[in-house]
Curated annotation (Swiss-Prot):
Entry protein name: Putative membrane protein IgaA homolog
Alphabetical list of Pfam families matching this protein: IgaA
InterPro entries named in the record: IgaA (IPR010771)
Source organism superkingdom: Bacteria
Family: Belongs to the IgaA family.
TM stretches of this protein: 2-22, 214-234, 235-255, 349-369, 663-683
Main location group: membrane
Location in or out of the cell: Cell inner membrane
């Protein structure tokens, strides 16, 4: 898990670093894109012929008009009674030709100069040769270059300065335009520019950023914090720094105050809006063919039933430079709509819900949260340190989760109730990561008569099948002859029968072993064989066995004895799990040993049956009453049915681990808070958005005090 988290964390950090470098590199505006934001960075170079034509045109303009230097687009010049044409001076950047397809907006200026028009691409003023006005269409293919002041148009819809003649030789502009032209006749209504203002924050909110990028950045920051808390320590500070930086950047762009640079310009005009048939297209929607003088107006779609009240009347109209209407008349206002019925953007809330839920699921799956939460709460409340050496002192001491406890004394190692799950303990079946500590006498060591009988049976069969030295009860010559023949002699068959009966006293015990002994003793049944042995009739009876038969008999006896030994060992182990009631059970939730004894060389269950019993007795003598030392932070306190108080301890964490615990708890709270808050906001905003247009229409209906219907088409 740690390797996967490390790889993912490093990969994600690298991607974010590359993304930030790319963003910092390309966010710096190119000189031409700073002046003309709509222009792409692709360009071509001026040809020598174009260069000569441009210089001739500029020289001709300088000879004909006296240019005064003026910076690019001074919006107040539109309202001035006199305005001068800005000087056009080529610069080294003028060798780059940029192509763009845009609508050209023309404004008239009250002036005595022959050229009283100003031309704009979006909100940027450009210099357009006046003779090319007749070539303007709705969408224009424009080539332009940058000059010292404003961009110069060198090509318009295929017309270039290469074939440009002196303006003195141009024919007068026809009063009517072609059917595809977007410029009205000269006798169109005069537009009065009242002033130019910045849009309001409410108007900006309609087209401003929706916060999705910032929400995604916050989600990535939360994911980085998860990787930092679950990954190795070496990556923790770097991931935290990146996550905090992303969060600060996102929060700044979400909640920062608007600057003048963010707000677009709004032109406040006074004129008579009229409906026209544009470009020979009479089938356009009625909302798309309203003009104020030469300016084609673009209305919000839901204003359709209302803006017709001002058609043919002098009225105030506020528009963006892209001809989008912001306010008209006394009632129609995007500012008022946003103020009374705010637009509810819920995309960022949905993004934060998905991101928070993803990180929360990862946190619940891969990070244990119980201990960090407990230690964090205890740290905030202020933990105390307690030290005891007796049960009585611990019993009187007020304990709470998060306190530091140091206990030392003599107690009994804990024995789990299920012996099958004790194979992983150092002192199996004892689990010395838990200590029973009370004032009662220690439990007695395990003893069993059944195991003693089994050991006696195994001992006698081993002694007879594997004799050590010569047996005085057997004739030496007979023993030598038997050994040469390869046979094995049982010289005390009666003892085997009696000890088998002592161990297997029930009729259902040791069936196979009893049958084998009956056959060897040539008896009718087991009861008859036992009676003969008890009466002494089998005294001095020797039994000869082939080696195979001897091995079979030995295996039968060992199997029968082992079954009794295992059963008794299990019962004795269960008896060790019955400590006296009361007292304390102190455990380490990390599995640390609380005693200082060397570990056994072999686990208990790797021994044979009888060796297991002997090892259990040795461990019992060692661990039923043993010195212990336990210290750590209390993570849990419970009391069982016997009145024993269970105290779980965890080693005191270092500063880095404690910081991880606190940060994990804080991240969990942040995720839950973010999830709940954004779910509530998502539901509220979705419901308000569903009713927003109905509320706006109801508001306008009340303002105009009538039910409006689309008027007939005006020609």
């Amino acid at each position: 898990m740690s390797t996967i988290v490390l790889i993912l964390a490093l990969l994600l950090t690298s991607l974010i670093a590359v993304g930030l470098l790319w963003w910092l590199r390309f966010r710096r505006p190119h000189p031409i894109t700073a002046a003309l934001p709509f222009v792409k960075l692709t360009h071509r170079k001026l040809t020598p012929e174009e260069r000569v034509s441009i210089e001739n045109y500029l020289r001709n303009q300088q000879n004909k008009h006296g240019f005064n230097t003026q910076p690019a687009f001074d919006s107040h010049a539109l309202a001035a009674s006199t305005s001068s044409t800005p000087m056009l001076v080529l610069t080294p950047q003028s060798d780059n030709v940029y192509s763009v397809t845009r609508a050209i907006t023309r404004y008239g200026v009250a002036s005595d100069e022959p050229n009283k028009w100003r031309y704009y691409l979006d909100s940027i003023e450009v210099h357009l040769p006046s003779a090319w006005e007749q070539y303007i269409t709705q969408d224009n293919d424009v080539e332009l270059i940058q000059t010292q002041t404003i961009p110069l148009v060198i090509s318009l819809n295929g017309h270039t300065l290469n074939n440009h003649q002196s303006e003195n030789t141009y024919q007068p502009i026809l009063p009517s335009v072609s059917k595809n032209a977007s410029i009205r006749k000269e006798d169109s209504e005069h537009i009065e520019l009242l002033n130019i203002r910045k849009e309001t924050p409410e108007e900006y909110a309609l087209h401003g950023p929706n916060g999705l990028k910032e929400a995604c950045a916050i989600c990535i920051a939360l994911l980085l914090l998860f990787f930092a808390l679950s990954g190795p320590t070496v990556t923790l500070p770097w991931l935290v720094i990146v996550a905090v930086s992303l969060t600060c950047w996102a929060c700044w762009y979400l909640f920062r105050p608007l600057s003048e640079k963010d707000l677009r310009e709004v032109h406040c005009l006074n004129g008579t809006p009229k409906r026209w048939g544009l470009f020979g297209e009479s089938n356009q929607g009625q909302i798309n063919n309203i003009s104020l003088g030469i300016v084609d107006l673009i209305y919000p779609a839901h204003w359709g039933p209302y803006f017709v009240h001002d058609l043919g009347k002098k009225t105030h109209i506020d528009i963006y430079l892209n001809r989008q209407v912001v306010r008209q008349g006394a009632f129609l206002s995007l500012h008022d709509e946003m103020k009374m019925f705010p637009l509810q953007r819920w995309g960022k809330n949905l993004t934060l819900i998905v991101g928070s839920l993803l990180v929360l699921v990862l946190l619940l799956i891969y990070v244990p949260l119980g201990l960090p939460l407990k230690l964090s709460v205890a740290w905030l409340q202020g933990a105390q340190s307690q030290q005891v050496t007796s049960v009585a002192a611990l019993d009187k001491m007020p304990l709470r989760i998060g306190d530091m406890l140091k206990a030392q004394g003599n107690g009994m190692c804990y024995v789990p109730p299920n012996i099958q799950n004790t194979r992983g303990f150092v002192f199996t079946p004892f689990d010395c990561s838990g200590i029973y500590w009370n004032t009662a006498s220690p439990l007695p060591q395990p003893e069993s008569e059944t195991i003693e009988k089994a050991a006696a049976l195994v001992e006698t069969i081993n002694k007879q099948l594997h004799p050590q030295g010569s047996d005085a009860s057997v004739n030496p010559k007979l023993a030598t002859a038997i050994e040469k023949s390869g046979m094995i002699l049982l010289d005390d068959f009666s003892d085997i029968v009696l000890k088998t009966q002592a161990l297997c006293s029930e009729n259902t015990d040791c069936i196979r072993l009893k049958n084998a002994l009956v056959n060897l003793g040539n008896a009718k049944n087991w009861s008859a064989l036992v009676k003969r042995a008890q009466s002494g009739n089998l005294e001095g009876m020797n039994v000869l066995l082939r080696p195979i038969s001897a091995d079979v008999l030995e295996n039968l006896i060992n199997t029968a004895a082992s079954s009794f030994v295992y059963r008794e060992t299990h019962l004795a182990t269960e008896a060790l799990n019955s400590p006296p009631p009361g007292g304390f059970l102190i455990t380490s939730d990390e599995g640390k040993q609380l005693v200082n004894h060397p570990a056994p060389t072999l686990p208990l269950f790797d021994y044979s049956a009888l060796e297991q019993w002997r090892e259990l007795q040795r461990l019992s003598a060692l661990l039923l009453d043993t010195p212990f030392k336990a210290e750590g932070i209390i993570t849990n306190i419970t009391t069982d049915a016997n009145g024993t108080r269970h105290i779980a301890l965890h080693s005191e964490p270092d500063i880095v681990t404690l910081g991880r615990y606190l940060a994990t708890s804080l991240l969990l709270l942040v995720l839950i808070f973010c999830l709940v808050v954004n779910m509530v906001l998502l539901i509220q905003r979705a419901m308000k958005n569903r009713r927003r247009m109905d509320n706006i229409q109801r508001y306008y209906d009340d303002c105009f005090n009538q039910t409006l219907t689309p008027p007939p088409f005006l020609r």
